[in-house]
Amino acid sequence: MNLEDISMIMKLFDSNMHKLQGNLRSYQTEMHQIHKELTEKLSHADLLYRSLIPLHDHLVASLSEVNAHVMKLNVQLHINRQSVRLGDYEYYEKSIDNPYSSIRSGLQAIEKPGCAEAICQSSKPAFVECLPSSTSEEVPVVAVQEASSTNQLDAISVVNENLSEERDATPQPLAVSKNMEETMPSNPFHEQLEGSLEEIPVGSKIVVETEKANNPVRSEASAPATSDNQSLLAAKQGTQTIGTGICNKISKSTINMPNNWQLENPTEVTAASIEKVNKLPKSPRNRFLLPPKGGTETTRRDIYNQILKDMAAFPENTIVTAVLASVDVTDNCAYVAKWDESSDRIKKVLQRQLPLQELDQLPDYGDIFAVLDSINNIITRITINSSSAGGGYDAYLIDFGEHIHFDGNETIFKLPDDIKRLPAQAIRCDLINCDIANMHCFVNTYIKIRVHENNNSTLVAEPVIDRLSRPTKTNTTKYPAGITEDDMAMLNEIDESTSDPLKAVLGFRPKDEQRICRHYDPKLNGCFKGNNCRFAHEPFAPNGATKDVELARALPETIFDTTVHFEIGSIVGILITFINGPTEVYGQFLDGSPPLVWDKKDVPENKRTFKSKPRLLDIVLALYSDGCFYRAQIIDEFPSEYMIFYVDYGNTEFVPLSCLAPCENVDSFKPHRVFSFHIEGIVRSKNLTHQKTIECIEYLKSKLLNTEMNVHLVQRLPDGFLIRFLDDWKYIPEQLLQRNYAQVSQ
């Protein structure tokens, strides 16, 4: 019997269980979202019936297949648990069927069965259904593990209240800030809080000394470490480097920590202040924190979605004043915070006005606690979502929207339950019509945003402050009179050079000497080697010229077609082939021309080889998803694929080189069949979001795509025609206006 094999298998089992839990949660969320969208769109079934069929089929097929696999998994769990049962006493103490044992290990070995029952009743994962009492023994292990890491924190608060009545009395705040409701929302933070806070001294480790008699609190830091923990800490101390605490991570983006929330003069304090306020530690810990006992590891996106946020403070189609908390250029988003009167308790924690209990062990994954920033002298709320591959943990500052690395030797504190349950201040915001990279200069200032979309998790907004749209001033270089910047750029332009004089003069290196025989004799029309010579027997070009040239191909003999000219003001027939936007479509004139399409039999494999690599703007034959080839023009080139435009239908695709074939001159010189048509009287709505744009395109597809109709040519545009719909389609512009997809053109 090898215990190392069992340990490795157990580690693999735990890792797979965490992945399974995360996948089940994300899958359930996605299916509920699809079901919600399907239910909402059923009210417009007459308009979107065709587009709802694939959505309905996908939902039914996916749920059926996943349900089958889940049922098989439950059966396998039941079979395997029946086969590995221990003795009666041992099984009751260690089995996963015993809810008390798992909850006891996840919540610091609480031995009260009543507390364990409260936990099981008050917290369970969203994807686990309620089972009857007769089948409670078959509840998967997921339900037990998740009981200690749920977002609600209700079960944890119940256990904490039942542990000891001593914890019910929360120490009163030692310094109270003045009323902040009188501040103007357009002022920055330092103007709001200036002069309203008492100075708080910074000292050694936190111990509530002034209220020991009335409010004793048992500190988890006072518990002696076990022999296993001591050996673990001793091994880690060999590579531990004492820095300045978590501030090394937070200070990389310290602009998201307002300077006014820091203590300006921590050394200039009176004796009365020192006696009044308990000192907080400023330096990092000398030993590592114990790892979390429970919880579920999640991704960065999942931990953000799990945390409670006050999304109701940002209603749609309104202008809201908020603080720009941080900017994430890599994810192309920003985080905004309201910081209104409902966050006063969070501000007191941030300003170190509340006595907190220091912890020696990290809370469960997903649990909210506080951490000390020793450089900025602030305490902020934080949660850890997963362990890092290189050591430490991935953590998330819930009030500033920053993901940081947590070493495990920081100074952390336990938060009161009421502060834990307060919504997170940082809310993800996808800003449109602005450059995210230029938003760093507005961090920690109030900005006004127009909220276009609020999906209860993320905002889609647009900044409306004038200074955000002002161009940044750049230092211009003064040039002598009469010389412009373009002239100086032309003078300073130095092309790539070469040390080969032939390549510098001709642009290439001739290969005459490598190709022509040096012993060629015109009288013999050969050389002394006879037929054994492998070089070309011809004279060199006179005067050092070269014969190494490539002849251009002759012009093809073909008949060029001309485009049909249509008179402005006439009524013509068109076929809509592609919807390019809310007010623009692509189509063909119905002039009786046969369609330009090639079957795979017309383009066999031996005809799909290019003599040279295709270049930009070349006309080629491109394979479409229906198995046929159509004319296309190369408009961009990438390492493994090409971006092409179907010149006869108007759609754009990305295809590899294997899906392209040469197009003969007789076909490539024919005029493009597709034209751009703009709808008269309307333009794209300024407030149209990306999601609304997709909805508008789907709506126009159901109405216009692959439809032949008569239209009135109103005007010739540089890139197409301005048309007016007739007959059954004349109400299309009005319907687009009613749905807020477009607005009246001026």
UniProtKB/Swiss-Prot annotation:
Query: Biological process GO terms, please?
Result: negative regulation of oskar mRNA translation; oocyte dorsal/ventral axis specification; oocyte karyosome formation; secondary piRNA processing; transposable element silencing by piRNA-mediated mRNA destabilization
The segments labelled Involved in homooligomerization in the record are 1-310
Say which family it is in: Belongs to the Tudor domain containing protein family.
Q: Which residues form the Tudor domain?
A: 613-670
Q: Subunit structure of this entry?
A: Homooligomerizes (via N-terminus). Component of the ping-pong piRNA processing (4P) complex consisting of krimp, aub and AGO3; a single molecule of krimp can bind both aub and AGO3 without the need for homooligomerization. Interacts (via canonical tudor domain) with aub (via N-terminus when symmetrically dimethylated on arginine residues). Interacts (via non-canonical tudor domain) with AGO3 (via N-terminus when unmethylated on arginine residues); this interaction leads to symmetrical dimethylation on AGO3 arginine residues and its subsequent dissociation from krimp.
What does the record's free text say on domains? Answer: Possesses two tudor domains, a C-terminal canonical tudor domain and a central non-canonical tudor domain. Both tudor domains can interact with Piwi proteins allowing the simultaneous binding of aub and AGO3; this brings them in close proximity to facilitate their role in ping-pong ampification of piRNAs. The canonical tudor domain possesses a hydrophobic pocket that preferentially binds methylated aub; the interaction requires symmetrical methylation on at least one aub N-terminal arginine.
Q: What does this protein do?
A: Stable structural component of the perinuclear meiotic nuage, a germline-specific subcellular membraneless ribonucleoprotein compartment involved in production of transposable element-repressing Piwi-interacting RNA (piRNA)-induced silencing complexes (piRISCs), which are essential for maintaining germline integrity during oogenesis. Scaffold component of the ping-pong piRNA processing (4P) complex that recruits the Piwi proteins aub and AGO3 to specific subregions of the nuage where it coordinates their activity in the ping-pong amplification step of secondary piRNA biogenesis.
Places the protein is found: Cytoplasm; Cytoplasm, Perinuclear region; Cytoplasm, Cytoplasmic ribonucleoprotein granule
Give start-end ranges for the coiled-coil region(s).
none
Q: Enumerate the UniProt keywords alphabetically.
A: Cytoplasm, Differentiation, Metal-binding, Oogenesis, Zinc, Zinc-finger
* Name this polypeptide is given: Tudor domain-containing protein krimp
Indicate the secretion signal residues.
none
Instruction: Show the Pfam families listed in the entry.
Output: TUDOR (PF00567), Tudor_krimper_1st (PF24047)
Alphabetized GO MF terms: zinc ion binding
Q: Which PROSITE patterns match?
A: TUDOR, ZF_C3H1
Q: Which organism is it from?
A: Drosophila melanogaster
User: Which tissue types show expression of this protein?
Assistant: Widely expressed in female germline cells, including differentiating germ cells in germarium and egg chambers (at protein level).
Which Gene3D superfamilies does this entry report, sorted A to Z? Answer: 2.30.30.140, 2.40.50.90
The UniProt entry, under SMART domains, shows: TUDOR (SM00333)
Q: Zinc finger spans (C3H1-type)? A: 511-540
Result of knocking out the encoding gene: Females are sterile due to defective oogenesis; defects in germ cell meiotic progression and loss of dorso-ventral oocyte polarity. Oocyte nucleus fails to form a compact karyosome by stage 3 of oogenesis. Precocious translation of osk mRNA prior to stage 9 of oogenesis, probably due to defective RNA silencing.
Gene Ontology terms, cellular component aspect?
A: P granule; perinuclear region of cytoplasm
Region Non-canonical tudor domain: start-end pairs: 311-489
